[in-house]
Regions:
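Active-site regions of metal-assisted phosphoester/phosphodiester hydrolases
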Residues: 10-54, 66, 78, 83-86, ...
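Bacterial N-terminal signal peptides
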Residues: 1-7
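A short beta-strand-loop structural module common to alpha/beta enzyme folds
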Residues: 56-61
Length: 255
């Protein structure tokens, strides 16, 4: 199921006045921080502090028992003053669980693809949104791929991403998410056939994102499609323990 939550003006703030945009990807661990408290306000505060225009969220609850059956996508939309598109990947504790995108830009259309599964486990998906960015279409993709030690499922997920983007050829694409694999892995090598890892071109340092209190691995990424008229100006990892991951933020220029 897909849901659209609207709060405030879609074109408010920085997004309406500049040809640059800020993108964030953030696995929010259903809003639970390293202190084991669920606090959506601090997630929204971080988004606002980083002045993000588009945010890819993973591990988002809607009507789930562990988060008191709250409509977390709608709450995050209201707290951030943005539009939220939520995609359910599987039913959990009486509610829905999946990915979501917050955006200041108008949403033209969206769809969600459930990945094929080779083994029983958590259903994963690819949320695909076409945004109107200053009169130009931008394809924004949000995913959370398989986490298990054997990369068979992740490689299949990467193949499905390559298949899913075929209708968007010729348009700039930004792919965000938790890939549960490190740079140089077979998963990332597959994704890199179609996309450029923006940390490799505009990041400083190692870009480690998990665990949040003392990160040891980089598994969260912002990618841009090769040849896209989008330039990564800088990419960084803010310090935060509002989730078990740290977010990744990138500033981009539309050429």
């Amino acid at each position: 199921m897909l849901a659209l939550c609207v709060a405030g003006c879609q074109t408010a703030g920085k997004a309406a006045t500049t040809n640059t945009l800020r993108v964030m990807t953030y696995n929010i661990h259903h809003g639970e921080g390293m202190d084991r408290k669920v606090d959506l306000q601090r997630i929204a505060d971080l988004i606002k502090h980083e002045q993000a225009d588009i945010v890819a969220l993973q591990e988002v609850d809607k009507g789930v028992q562990r988060t008191a059956k709250r409509d977390c996508p709608a709450e995050l939309a209201a707290l951030s003053g943005m539009t939220c598109v939520f995609s359910n990947n599987y039913h959990f504790q009486g509610g829905e669980y999946g990915n979501a995108v917050l955006t200041r830009f108008p949403v033209k259309r969206w769809t969600n693809r459930h990945y094929k599964m080779l083994r029983p486990g958590e259903q994963r998906g690819l949320l695909q949104i076409v945004l109107d960015v200053h009169g130009r279409e931008l394809v924004f993709l949000d995913t959370h791929v398989d986490f298990r030690g054997n990369d068979t499922e992740r490689l299949l997920n990467a193949d499905e991403i390559a298949e899913a983007i075929q209708p968007y050829r010729g348009r700039p694409m930004i792919l965000c998410g938790d890939f549960n694999d490190t740079p140089g892995s077979r998963t990332c090598q597959k994704v890199a056939q179609e996309f450029t890892d923006t940390w490799s071109t505009a990041g400083t340092g190692e870009g480690l994102t998990i665990p949040a209190e003392k990160p040891r691995k980089r598994i969260d990424y912002i990618w841009i499609s090769k040849g896209a008229p989008v330039e990564a100006l800088r990419v960084w990892v803010p310090e935060s323990e509002a989730s078990d991951h740290r977010p990744v933020v990138g500033e981009f220029k539309l050429r």
